[in-house]
A protein has these predicted regions:
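Transmembrane beta-barrel domains of Gram-negative outer membranes and organellar outer membranes
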Residues: 22-162, 167, 173-245
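Cleavable N-terminal export/targeting peptides
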Residues: 1-34
Length: 245
């Protein structure tokens, strides 16, 4: 019954987003720059391989609604199966708000945008589907053009992680730094390269390598991504599609 409820709520959200975004359907889409904000629905198949031999796989639904060109709300819901616990269900969900406060500061300094990012422990920790902690990040991203085909979007954020309930541990505060580079091969193909380091009680090194290709300009995109957690020896792979509304 819980799973049905999640699917129902997700379906309602998809319907609302699609109806409210009709006025933006003819907008030109340049998704190679993360500070360009568009209403979109992302759906991906995900596979995770953990150090202890556990494997998780399923789907990750990501809905982004652009209230206007400078404000965007993201909601992400993963539905995963853990082969070790033989459990399927919702994993930790994510909510993110992004606001571009300034664009085109100079010919190369193209944007500055604060953000708030919250990971909600909606997944079951005992079933291996969730982290059992809230993670809250507030920070800033800047956009900088290196060349017509290469741009960088470095970001820095303050991170707070709450006390866990189901295992020994304490709350943590730290810093997250990323250096997201976008490389455009053509008007349709581009690659994100994003090394990330998070300083908490221990330093966590992660990364993103995500190739994107626009099948239908302004409407449909596919992507292939590798998201390693080097510190905890976790490898995540995703194959997905994006529908711009």
């Amino acid at each position: 019954m819980k799973l049905f409820r999640y699917y129902f709520i997700l379906s309602m959200c998809l319907t609302v987003v699609q109806l409210s975004a009709q006025k933006m359907k003819d907008a030109s889409v340049d998704a190679s720059k993360p500070t360009n904000l568009y209403t979109q629905i992302n759906s991906a198949f995900e596979y995770q391989s953990l150090k202890n031999g556990t494997h998780l796989f399923g789907t990750r639904i990501n809905i982004q609604y652009a209230f206007n060109p400078d404000n965007l709300l993201l909601v992400e819901v993963p539905l995963l199966y853990n082969d070790n616990s033989k459990s399927f269900g919702i994993s930790d969900t994510r909510v993110r708000y992004f606001h571009v406060v300034k664009r085109n500061i100079t010919s190369r300094f193209i944007a500055i945008a604060p953000f708030a990012d919250v990971t909600i422990p909606s997944g079951s920790f005992t079933k291996g589907l969730g982290s059992d902690v809230w993670s809250i990040t507030a920070g800033l991203v800047a956009g900088y053009l290196i060349s017509p085909k290469i741009s960088m979007f470095p970001g820095i954020g303050y991170v707070h992680v709450t006390d866990p309930n189901k295992y020994a541990g304490s709350s943590q505060n730290g810093l997250n730094i990323q250096t997201n580079m976008s490389v455009s091969f053509s008007k349709r193909a581009f690659l994100f390269i994003n090394p990330i380091v998070t300083f908490l009680s221990k330093t966590i090194w992660t990364g993103e390598l995500n190739f994107n290709y626009m099948i239908t300009p302004n409407k449909l995109k596919i992507n292939f991504g590798y998201f390693p957690n080097f510190t905890n020896d976790i490898s995540t792979f995703r194959i997905g599609t994006t529908l711009f509304l």
